[in-house]
Amino acid sequence: MSLDSVHSHTLPNGLLVLTKEAHSAPIATCWVWYRVGSRNERSGLTGISHWVEHMLFNGTPTFPKGYLDRVIARNGGTFNGFTWLDYTAYFETLPAERLELGLQIESDRMVNALFLPEEVERERTVVISELEGYENQPENWLSEAVVATAFVAHPYHNPVIGYKSDLLAITRDDLYLHYQTYYKPNNAVLVLVGDFETDAVLQKVEHYFADLPPGLPLPPFYAVEPEPQGEKRVTIRRPGAAEQVQIAYLAPDCRHADFAPLVILDAVLSGARPLTFSGGGTQTNRSARLYQALVETQLANYAVSSYRPSRDPFIFELDALVRTEHKASEIETALLHEIEKIQNDGIKVEELAKVDKQLRAQIAYSYERVTNQALLLGTWEVLASFKRVDTLFDELAAVKPEDVQRVAQTYLTEMRRVVGHFIPTKSSLG
């Protein structure tokens, strides 16, 4: 993506606006990103960012509950929202001539969400039901336990969806205070991509957003995760169909100089993914090392790695679903062996070239749709800077085989790892 075509504009109230014209189709997308996620939650209020996201689909005086669904569908558009560790985002993708509708919706709910008590209680039920559905998946139990074990000081310790005890206790006032604190123009990024003229669309942005008042300074963030002092292990025993293994290593944030080599390492192990780092969790690249070593040999039903960008140091993880004739301990050994091979022998130039080609294909795919372009720009702006979209491409292209070996030796060590096993209880195996 050429940043020459991305324009940055900041309103007096602090709202950052990124625009990119894309005239290949008569479509435009409107995204608003807030710099708030589970990273900004304290004990007792876990899951509150995700719950607030739900509440913003429950109406304002201008757009009552249910109207949003109808008006966007009537105009041939799509919409959604999501919450992650470091951010919350909302979007509407519409025919280009109806982009103004997205601006109306997002400027309105930035300040006018109702948080009606009856809707708070309804969403409490919805969110708890979502949590219970999440807990029905063994891999989620294991992942939550591994991450909680990996982090002792940083709020990344907590699941984005929250703990049930907190979801039962959070009040309407808690939710509204969180909303009033973080949903302000000076804590938001508006990203517009599509078939429009920049000057004209900026006039509309100023019409809808310029009069919104900025918020007070955000609560300070002090948490720093201490360096790990040795391997930790956790075992989860619950109903399930098969044993699972997750190995997580504390790894650098996305602004670190070693981020690009670690992205390449992830691609070597599991295949390239888009620079939005969305998706994952299933094996898609049959030539990747983990697939060849664990799936082709019928040790595991799937085996993947994952390394996603985060504002603060998070994890580089390996996951595998064990075939019923094998044990988690065998799969752990096989996963660690693949890491040790890279640490000891490195990777070949040809392997790096293959991964580079895969990454270029994923990047090209990311640029195909206006929604993906906005996702890419917004993700990187809230984590670091939208300019990283260009610089990261250059960083990835500059990675050498010895860089991949070095980061494997530096970060994927016993000292920095948490090993998790999921062992099905006997009753679930019949």
What is the role of each PLM region?
Residues 107-117, 208-216, 336-347:
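A common structural junction motif
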Residues 377-388, 396:
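C-terminal, helix-dominated tail/subdomain
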Residues 47-60:
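Active-site SXXK
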Residues 52, 102, 106, 146, ...:
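Short alpha-helical scaffolding segments that buttress acidic/His motifs in well-ordered protein cores
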Residues 195:
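Carbohydrate-associated surface elements
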Residues 1-40, 62-98, 133-187, 211-259, ...:
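Non-catalytic beta-strand/loop surface segments
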